[in-house]
Amino acid sequence: MASLGVSEMLGTPLNFRAVSRSSAPLASSPSTFKTVALFSKKKPAPAKSKAVSETSDELAKWYGPDRRIFLPDGLLDRSEIPEYLNGEVAGDYGYDPFGLGKKPENFAKYQAFELIHARWAMLGAAGFIIPEALNKYGANCGPEAVWFKTGALLLDGNTLNYFGKNIPINLVLAVVAEVVLLGGAEYYRITNGLDFEDKLHPGGPFDPLGLAKDPEQGALLKVKEIKNGRLAMFAMLGFFIQAYVTGEGPVENLAKHLSDPFGNNLLTVIAGTAERAPTL
């Protein structure tokens, strides 16, 4: 019988096959060692276990008792984190100052609220930026394609204009379409029309690229989704405040700031020394 030994030299796995005395060794040696695939192009077997280990290490950063929390360990003792925040849910940093998630039913409810708002915020942030950027740099997306001014066109009895094409949608049709399409989809989700085990992360037809087929990768994607969603919610709040204060969209605000960082920033707007004085 042959036994297999593994060694490493300069980071390259080396496989040696030891031949026992009963397998007719050479006369010059009682046993023979044969180097197998020293310079083989085939990936070594431990590579898969290494990838699994890296994924497990990454999961440990975001789930479980040793996950990252909202303050460093030196500033927050983990014993101060509420027991119901045990790291089983994506995005759990141990932060619930108002105790909103003490009751399990409330925890599930607020988790759903946050995730749905996060998804809408990510779509909304893209919808605020992309049309205005396209319009500013060459495309014809309407008179200004600024998010709050586009909606005002419908209030004035106008129709929408995208890439130079008029879309015959007035205010009534826009409201009806929103209520029917969005409200219908939300009702279908609440009543579990497709009978999914996880209403918040259904997968299946809602994951056409199969990004979350691997459970561990799916868990990491949940973390990325909620982190980006929270950032998008703050971005939307910033867009609202910018529009109220400056009367401009986020792309125009950014362009003016980049063209003159010291003349167009938060301090100059508050002080009223910028060209666009605040309307507060």
UniProtKB/Swiss-Prot annotation:
Gene Ontology cellular-component terms for this entry are: chloroplast; chloroplast thylakoid; chloroplast thylakoid membrane; cytosol; photosystem I; photosystem II antenna complex; plastoglobule; PSII associated light-harvesting complex II
Annotated chlorophyll b 4 binding sites: 189
How many cofactors are bound and how? Binds at least 14 chlorophylls (8 Chl-a and 6 Chl-b) and carotenoids such as lutein and neoxanthin.
Q: Please list the residues that bind chlorophyll a 3.
A: 225
Location comes to: Plastid, Chloroplast thylakoid membrane
**Residue numbers binding chlorophyll a 4:** 228
- What does the PTM comment state? Photoregulated by reversible phosphorylation of its threonine residues.
User: Has keyword Amino-acid biosynthesis?
Assistant: no
Annotated residues that bind chlorophyll b 3 are located at 186
- The main location class comes to plastid
Query: Sorted alphabetically, which InterPro entries does this protein's record hold?
Result: Chloro_AB-bd_pln, Chloroa_b-bind
Which biological process, per GO, is one annotated for this protein?
Answer: photosynthesis
Question: What SUPFAM superfamilies does its record include?
Answer: Chlorophyll a-b binding protein (SSF103511)
The way it spans or sits in the membrane comes to: Multi-pass membrane protein
Which ranges does the record mark as transmembrane?
Answer: 110-130, 167-187, 231-251
Q: Does the UniProt entry include the keyword Protein biosynthesis?
A: no
Assembly information from the UniProt record: Forms heterotrimers with LHCB3. The LHC complex consists of chlorophyll a-b binding proteins.
Q: What is known of its domains?
A: The N-terminus of the protein extends into the stroma where it is involved with adhesion of granal membranes and post-translational modifications; both are believed to mediate the distribution of excitation energy between photosystems I and II.
Q: What is this protein called?
A: Chlorophyll a-b binding protein CP26, chloroplastic
Q: Which gene encodes it?
A: LHCB5
